[in-house]
Amino acid sequence: MALCALTRALRSLNLAPPTVAAPAPSLFPAAQMMNNGLLQQPSALMLLPCRPVLTSVALNANFVSWKSRTKYTITPVKMRKSGGRDHTGRIRVHGIGGGHKQRYRMIDFLRFRPEETKSGPFEEKVIQVRYDPCRSADIALVAGGSRKRWIIATENMQAGDTILNSNHIGRMAVAAREGDAHPLGALPVGTLINNVESEPGRGAQYIRAAGTCGVLLRKVNGTAIIQLPSKRQMQVLETCVATVGRVSNVDHNKRVIGKAGRNRWLGKRPNSGRWHRKGGWAGRKIRPLPPMKSYVKLPSASAQS
């Protein structure tokens, strides 16, 4: 009897997909007032019920990303530790958990970011250089015009220094000075660089760890070839901006932890103490360097022919 009743109930269900109705009026009238009008009035889609459990639902079709609603601030922001787990609660990265409470400071990795009312190269003054718990390198608070921002500090950067941010490529190479940001095409060959962009205007993505630096090897046909700290070569456009010098906190790899508890303070959990078989990866091997990584869209051979 129960099986017959369940069969009749399943047959009575309407399995047709939900139909989309016309956009409903604004559900968030306050969204227009946020971020000086950056948020537009979202249009909601009403789904008509097709099952008894789906009575009414409203979905936002054009709701902007949360990053566009976040206003930049130099004030440290509170963080919630994930313990290496994703949104499902499963561990994705082992060895993470616990540790002292940390506050996140928003780092501006796009060095050439002029103010709205100005254009061209501009200077900034270093206010302070301090420790950042969220990264191995030190950070610097710089000010220029009517704003302040955090950037990655270089090796010899101190409070009171003046740094230059430029996007101009001249006929002659500039006199490279530590802490300044220039396009790769404006720097002389052999310059030590850090915080390199992979695409113009995207922000620094390479050589950001403490004590690291790359080398500008050569410039070919509007592109620049640099050597990463791993000895791998990378080809990018010469308009990509890089910072001159070496990243701060050079002695980071020479520190002595001293005890296991200090690693727990840093948020590192212990791994298993069991003996693990060495599967062939252990030991030194002679491996060839990986091929050069290129972010430049070169024309193919078929297109040239």
Curated annotation (Swiss-Prot):
Residues 274-283 have a biased composition (Basic residues). The keyword Transferase does not apply. It comes from the Eukaryota. Keywords: Mitochondrion, Ribonucleoprotein, Ribosomal protein, Transit peptide. The keyword Ribosomal protein applies. Residues 1-60 form a transit peptide. Its main location: mitochondrion. Residues 264-283 are annotated as: Disordered. This is Large ribosomal subunit protein uL2m. The lineage of its organism: Eukaryota, Metazoa, Chordata, Craniata, Vertebrata.
